[in-house]
Amino acid sequence: MGCVCSKQLEGRRQEDISLLASQTFFSEAEVEVLHGLFIKLTSCLSNDNLLTKEKFQFILIKNTKKRSLSAERIFGLFDMRNDGAIDFGEFVHTLNIFHPNSSPRDKAIFAFRLYDTRETGFIEPEEVKEMIIDVLEESELMLSESIIDSIVSKTFEEADWKKDGIIDLEEWENFVATYPLTLKNMTIPFLKDIPRIFPTFLR
């Protein structure tokens, strides 16, 4: 009986892997490797095969106590069902956006949602400033408030061509098309060579 159940579970798992491969830029072999990586990541604090916000923040900044705006925003975008945990399917689908073959538009939309911390459908100056400060603090870097304000002002001067004090998705897409380096961190090169980078997860 146990053997039959085990085979059924393995068959279902293989179906899930095949489905994820068909929906993303990853091959079945690469999804297998990502599954091994996911299991390793989810076991950092407990073995429940889910990435909770606490685990996610621990992986990103090695600290579960300190609030991290960027970690919260990234977690929220991975957590597509908004149920407080990232499952393997959500993990793969979100990583797919960072794949080198993913479209610039998908990357731009993801980055836009990252900066739209209040989820209003547009980016406000205060949101950009908060994200800059958060990233600087996590990197243990310091910039004066006047320099940060100057960066924010310059960004809006370039991006907000409608001059209404906010950046909507259309303006954002125009901005990143003009300054493609803005999306540099939206591509993870090794996702195109997963089996070589993570050979220990091959089965």
From Swiss-Prot:
The keyword Lipoprotein applies. Keywords: Cytoplasm, Lipoprotein, Myristate, Nucleus, Repeat. Residues 30-65, 66-101, 103-138, 147-182 form the EF-hand domain. GO terms for biological process: calcium-mediated signaling; response to osmotic stress; response to salt stress; response to water deprivation. Its main location: cytoplasm. CDD domains: EFh. GO terms for molecular function: calcium ion binding; kinase binding. Homodimer. Interacts with PP2CA, CIPK2, CIPK11, CIPK23 and CIPK24. Belongs to the calcineurin regulatory subunit family. Expressed in green tissues, but not in the roots. This is Calcineurin B-like protein 5. It is found in: Cytoplasm; Nucleus. PANTHER family: CALCINEURIN B, CALCINEURIN B-LIKE PROTEIN 5. Disulfide bonds: none annotated. The record marks 139 as: Involved in dimerization. Both N-myristoylation and calcium-mediated conformational changes are essential for its function. A lipid is attached at residue 2 (N-myristoyl glycine). The gene is CBL5. Acts as a calcium sensor. CBL proteins interact with CIPK serine-threonine protein kinases. Binding of a CBL protein to the regulatory NAF domain of a CIPK protein lead to the activation of the kinase in a calcium-dependent manner. May function as a positive regulator of salt or drought responses. The N-terminal 12 amino acids are sufficient for cell membrane targeting of a heterologous protein. GO terms for cellular component: cytoplasm; nucleus. It comes from Arabidopsis thaliana. PROSITE patterns: EF_HAND_2. SMART domains: EFh.
